[in-house]
Curated annotation (Swiss-Prot):
One of its GO terms (cellular component) is cytosol. Keywords: Carbohydrate metabolism, Cytoplasm, Isomerase. The active site is at H20. GO terms for molecular function: D-ribose pyranase activity; intramolecular lyase activity; monosaccharide binding. It is found in: Cytoplasm. This is D-ribose pyranase. It comes from the Bacteria. Catalyzes the interconversion of beta-pyran and beta-furan forms of D-ribose. InterPro entries: D-ribose_pyranase, RbsD-like_sf, RbsD_FucU. Pathway: Carbohydrate metabolism; D-ribose degradation; D-ribose 5-phosphate from beta-D-ribopyranose: step 1/2. Homodecamer. GO terms for biological process: D-ribose catabolic process. It holds the Pfam family RbsD_FucU.
Length: 134
């Protein structure tokens, strides 16, 4: 059995397969998933699992170079934003970029995979760009 926090087989496989510059998205329950993009659906019910719990586990295994958020998130200020900002201050998320929600949906078409959470706070969506450990 694995010793690290991530136990989900599909998610572990995707993170292990990421190359430099690949995009992995963590999204709320309402974010559309484009055809052809792998969906790892973790959502069980409203709020389970929540966005922050999934982000914490993903960051335990993934090297992040940068991240992308929707500008609308800054207006709505869902609870996840405060956690993202603190992780950003700790340099765990690399460079931050803000784009429109529509542009984030367009960016999702290029994602290697999208992780759907049970999060139901609006605009709780994040694109993580894979970095390298060397």
């Amino acid at each position: 059995m694995k010793k690290t926090p991530l136990l989900n087989i599909a998610l572990s496989r995707v993170i292990a397969s990421l190359g430099h510059g690949d995009i992995l998205m963590i999204v709320d329950a309402g974010m559309p998933v484009p055809p052809g993009v792998e969906l790892i659906d973790l959502a069980l019910t409203r709020g389970v699992p929540d966005f922050v719990s999934v982000l914490d586990v993903v960051l335990s295994e993934m090297q992040v170079e940068s991240h992308v958020l929707a500008r609308e998130m800054a207006d709505i200020k869902p609870p996840a934003l405060q956690i993202i900002e603190s992780l950003n201050l700790d340099d765990q998320l690399g460079q931050q970029r803000w784009i429109s929600h529509e542009d984030l949906k367009a960016l999702s078409r290029t994602a290697k995979a999208i992780i759907r959470t049970g999060e139901c706070q609006p605009y709780s969506n994040l694109a993580l760009v894979s970095g390298v450990v060397f």
